[in-house]
Amino acid sequence: MAKLHDYYRDQVVNELKAKFNYSSVMQVPRIEKITLNMGVGEALTDKKLLDNAVADLTAISGQKPLITKARKSVAGFKIRQGYPIGCKVTLRGERMWEFFERLITIAVPRIRDFRGLNAKSFDGRGNYSMGVREQIIFPEIDYDKVDRVRGLDITITTTAKSDEEGQALLAAFNFPFRK
């Protein structure tokens, strides 16, 4: 079992229950899922790029990504409906907690010129989204085998009702928000 999950149950739940005066433990916000998305627009010209992106996302997440396809044709981007343009992974349960732990302890500190994550990236319902410019911050990616530096989007979906609750939840895990 992931250490952060134990920490959540033993410490964070009690802290947040006291802070927001919840009557039940079930009212305390929790992390529901973490979604990783990698858009590969260049996959239109070279199919190998999408395969490499899928391999990177598989190494980072530990599970096989779903290839996302264009929903509609856009002439300006030279894409047609159904073209593969990216990949995504939804992590839940044990894999989610393990990824979250690696994200906080290993990956985020390796971001170049890191000064903290923006606390304004909440969506109004307690969900947090962040972008990573380089996939090489994750230790699972071998720097020598990378053909191209790609970014990815990470969305942390919580059961929080407001941004304040969501931020308190992530801050309880020592999420590195900018001061």
Swiss-Prot record:
The lineage of its organism: Bacteria, Pseudomonadati, Pseudomonadota, Gammaproteobacteria, Pasteurellales. The keyword Amino-acid biosynthesis does not apply. It comes from Actinobacillus pleuropneumoniae serotype 5b (strain L20). SUPFAM superfamilies: RL5-like. This is Large ribosomal subunit protein uL5. One of its GO terms (biological process) is translation. Keywords: Ribonucleoprotein, Ribosomal protein, RNA-binding, rRNA-binding, tRNA-binding. Part of the 50S ribosomal subunit; part of the 5S rRNA/L5/L18/L25 subcomplex. Contacts the 5S rRNA and the P site tRNA. Forms a bridge to the 30S subunit in the 70S ribosome. GO terms for molecular function: rRNA binding; structural constituent of ribosome; tRNA binding. Transmembrane segments: none annotated. InterPro entries: Ribosomal_uL5, Ribosomal_uL5_bac-type, Ribosomal_uL5_C, Ribosomal_uL5_CS, Ribosomal_uL5_dom_sf, Ribosomal_uL5_N. GO terms for cellular component: ribonucleoprotein complex; ribosome. Belongs to the universal ribosomal protein uL5 family. NCBIfam families: PRK00010.1 (NF000585). It comes from the Bacteria. This is one of the proteins that bind and probably mediate the attachment of the 5S RNA into the large ribosomal subunit, where it forms part of the central protuberance. In the 70S ribosome it contacts protein S13 of the 30S subunit (bridge B1b), connecting the 2 subunits; this bridge is implicated in subunit movement. Contacts the P site tRNA; the 5S rRNA and some of its associated proteins might help stabilize positioning of ribosome-bound tRNAs. PROSITE patterns: RIBOSOMAL_L5.
